[in-house]
Amino acid sequence: MTRTQGDAVPPEESFSLDHFIGLYEAKDDPWDNATKWNDQRKYAVAMASLPRVRYRRCYEPGCAVGMLSVMLAERCDEVLAVDCVDEAVVQARAATAGLANVRVERALLPAELPDGTFDLVVIGDLLYYLSDDDLRLMLDGTLARLEAGGDLLAVHFRDRQNPGNYDGFNVHARLAAHPGLQPVIRHEDEWFVLDVFRKIG
């Protein structure tokens, strides 16, 4: 899929909390993360793309129902997974029940970023919901919490039916332009784009 950087812009305002609450009120798993083959494949590619065998502390904002959180628990000593919707948190906690190294919390981003630092950050299908200002705050705040030499994995949906729309292509271009990040791995197909960056310094 051929794209030109800058051919779409972020939403003027970040998608509201009410928007996401409404999605969960209409359907337990709004994006069918637990059952859709494309998401299962995306998660498998994401896990295979992590450069290191094991990480000390992982931050996963926008964890939804916790499918990727379960997989990250196998590779990380500690996982902090967060979502803004109470119902998503309930489901993610159920999915990770029995995994003592996973903590699921409710957080509204970018206002409620976590304390401490991480050697892995995993962001999936989140950044294109943010306004330009909130995206900048989210990236700056998240990267401030990523340790030097730590990895950031981002994976986002590609809108193959409407290739001019603001999607994963655009938010990953913003990530790639962020100072202090070194590209490590890139995967792109008709369904999603995935990048792994390493923090320099």
Predicted regions and their residues:
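Short glycine-rich loop/turn motifs that provide flexible caps or phosphate-binding loops at active sites
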Residues: 61, 123, 149
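A short acidic, Gly/Pro-enriched loop at the edge of an enzyme's catalytic core
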Residues: 113-121
